[in-house]
Amino acid sequence: STLIDARTQELVEARDEISSSIRYAAKLQKTLLPKSFPGDIDIEVEWRPRDLVGGDIYFIKDFPDKVYIAVVDCTGHGVPGAFLSIIARSHLDKAIRENENQTAGEYLSEVNELLRATLSRADQSNTNEEGFDGGVCIYRREARTLEFAGAKASLFNVDGEEATEVGGDRKSVGSSRIPEGFKYATHYIKRPSGAFV
């Protein structure tokens, strides 16, 4: 009985330590999410991860002439998805730093190449299908144009009572199944009234 009690106590302590680490990781992951949104654009976000940490993130980068917006659903749940979301977030930033003058499709294509390179270095056998599904938008303020590129994701533009779906490409970002050099399509929406991804 004392052996069983001791083993039970060890398991409880291990569980508590893991739970504490995951709660702290969730707090760290939240710091990657935008704290504020551009004042001239109505942006609403509902972020309710299934687990404390996971692979769902959103990203906003505001410039005087344009705004980059991304919604990302990384493969995997829990801790693996969270790690992948950190890598994806890093590449979303890097692709903008490398070229601020790109279309949404070029931007998503660059993120795809960066993620593929990172994942192929991590797993030489490349048997897993890590990556993400999601959409990126670039809103150009002066032209009042929204560009959209999607990876197994769609954008919906709601105008009054009519909703129009703009489908993305049927290829996940980072997937080893995508031909090298694949380019995501850019879709243009003039004066979007109620677009959401």
Q: What residue ranges belong to the model's regions?
A:
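… and, occasionally, acidic/histidine-rich disordered N-termini of signaling adaptors
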Residues: 7-194
